[in-house]
């Protein structure tokens, strides 16, 4: 897994600045799918499967594990909204920034307007936004219902 992470750092640092968004998206999706394979995780959708080809999609989900982000990106390219503190995390914060994560400073109420504008721009251009409204991960036993 460490080699897979190193591969991502090298590709993003050396190639991403010169690649089209479409090509970067394909690389990200393949990397995420390979990560699921390395971890022996199989994606299974139960119930009514959503049409993931739809443009302008917002995914709203509970956040059980750090794997949620990679699993969703293995199925469909997603730009996530994350707390600004993640940006300063070693390696993962840099990768999140370089792959288009929107960071929000939850201590500054006015930052919501900035992030909302960025989300609108992404959605209006056909992108997909992912949010975890609980704002944290949990073991899943105390998940709160959506209303």
Sequence positions of predicted segments:
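A transmembrane-helix-recognition feature enriched in membrane-embedded lipid enzymes
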Residues: 1-44, 94-99
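Soluble catalytic domains of membrane acyltransferases
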Residues: 37-147
